């Protein structure tokens, strides 16, 4: 079975190769080129001890992504998340008409795909690189082996950091929805006649 999407072959957009191919194409950095100091600066790893940061920095691969590459696709199976070290990416959702709409921008220290670590569902959105980017790939197996089986406290902190970010995103979404619904109500509310 091919990883290629015939619908996107004619466009300038590319899809991220399968995991084995990605491992061969990690670019200028070795797959294990992280440092504990780099991870410490990212909120996802907040509160983790030095030893755990050391284990993660040795185990988590870095991937170099070119402009136009679709890192993940809405609806695809998912078992990994990504942390942005460098670059700029856009998060896209399909509208009811089928058009893709940008719903967020991602830059250094952002992460995406975390829901796949928690709920084992298909991708809820697509992510495409707008600039050359360097990403850390964290699979469910990494979380299990490096955190859950090794140190339950570290695992709990990691999941709590994800929960905090999901809560922040939900608050932003609630605010946007309230603003939108208020605007719709103003336009379509019956006018009082005097």
What are these regions (language model features)?
Residues 1-194:
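Cytosolic regulatory regions built on CNB/CRP/Popeye-like sensor folds
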């Amino acid at each position: 079975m091919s990883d290629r999407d015939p619908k996107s072959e004619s466009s300038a957009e590319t899809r991220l190769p399968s995991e084995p191919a990605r491992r061969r194409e990690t670019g200028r950095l070795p797959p294990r080129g992280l440092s504990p100091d780099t991870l410490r600066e990212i909120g996802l790893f907040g509160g983790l001890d030095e030893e755990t940061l050391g284990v993660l920095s040795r185990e988590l691969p870095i991937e170099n992504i070119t402009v136009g590459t679709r890192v993940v696709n809405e609806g695809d199976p998912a078992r990994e998340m990504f942390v942005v070290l460098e670059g700029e990416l856009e998060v896209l959702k399909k509208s009811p008409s089928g058009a893709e709409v940008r719903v967020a921008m991602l830059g250094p220290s952002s992460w995406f795909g975390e829901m796949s670590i928690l709920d084992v569902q298909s991708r809820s959105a697509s992510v495409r690189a707008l600039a050359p980017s360097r990403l850390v790939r964290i699979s469910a197996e990494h979380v299990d082996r490096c955190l859950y089986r090794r140190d339950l406290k570290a695992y709990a902190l990691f999941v709590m950091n994800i929960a905090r970010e999901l809560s922040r995103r939900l608050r932003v979404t609630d605010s946007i929805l309230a603003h939108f619904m208020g605007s719709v109500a103003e336009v379509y509310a019956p006018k009082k006649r005097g």
